[in-house]
């Protein structure tokens, strides 16, 4: 069991560090809005994984992924939500983040945003279906408990990796905040990241 879990931790670390929509999103948010906003987003993204773990453990993920209409519907909802977020950033004032009078971030709202993004990304479901069964140490007995152990391990490791990304990006954000001209660049960077993730979800 221990050897299998250690292998799973290594695999999770490598996957979390590999360029992908989630860590790119966390990095973008940390650069644009600071480490606290990025950590709130990270907490939301990771918390959504417990739902995917539950769906996997009880066989619901397999049912969803084998239903083309339902699976496609989730993909469309996820893409539309991301495009809505891109539009919200587009409508925002690019200079707000650099003003001393800028409104405080609603971290609860950012957390919820991360959760919704995770839940409406069916590729996370496919990822769990492909990865987790490979690391069951007793495939014939009590797989529900094993899936939850793997799920919690995945969440902890991913949060640590994404948290480091958020902190590193946040330290750069402090420097960027001194230059008002970066506001427009970061605004459009966020928009492009949202659109790119939406496209990633829709592509088969």
Predicted regions and their residues:
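Juxtamembrane transmembrane-helix termini in multi-pass membrane transport proteins
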Residues: 2-72, 130-150, 154-155
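Hydrophobic/aromatic residues within the transmembrane alpha-helices of Major Facilitator Superfamily
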Residues: 13, 17, 50-51, 87, ...
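Juxtamembrane helix-boundary/capping and inter-helix hinge elements in multi-pass membrane proteins
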Residues: 30-37, 105, 177-181
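Membrane helix-loop-helix hairpins that form the core translocation module of multi-pass transporters
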Residues: 36-109, 168
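Hydrophobic alpha-helical transmembrane segments in multi-pass integral membrane proteins
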Residues: 53-57, 119-125, 193-204
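Selective transmembrane alpha-helices of multi-pass membrane proteins
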Residues: 66-94, 161-165, 173-204
């Amino acid at each position: 069991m221990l050897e299998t879990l250690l292998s799973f931790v290594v695999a999770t670390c490598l996957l979390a560090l590999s360029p992908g929509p989630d860590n790119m999103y966390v990095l973008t948010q940390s650069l644009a809005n600071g480490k606290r906003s990025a950590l709130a987003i990270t907490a939301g993204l990771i918390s959504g994984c417990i739902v995917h773990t539950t769906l996997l453990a009880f066989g619901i993920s397999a049912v969803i992924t084998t239903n083309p209409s339902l699976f496609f519907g989730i993909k469309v909802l996820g893409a539309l939500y991301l495009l809505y977020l891109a539009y919200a950033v587009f409508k925002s004032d690019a200079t707000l983040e650099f003003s001393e009078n800028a409104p405080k971030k609603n971290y609860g709202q950012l957390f919820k945003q991360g959760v919704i993004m995770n839940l409406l990304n069916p590729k996370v479901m496919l990822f769990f279906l492909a990865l987790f069964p490979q690391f069951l140490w007793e495939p014939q007995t009590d797989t529900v408990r094993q899936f939850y152990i793997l799920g919690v391990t995945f969440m902890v490791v991913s949060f640590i990796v994404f948290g480091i990304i958020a902190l590193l990006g946040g330290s750069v954000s402090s420097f960027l905040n001194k230059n008002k001209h970066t506001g427009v660049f970061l605004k459009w960077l966020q928009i492009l990241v949202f659109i790119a993730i939406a496209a990633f979800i829709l592509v088969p």
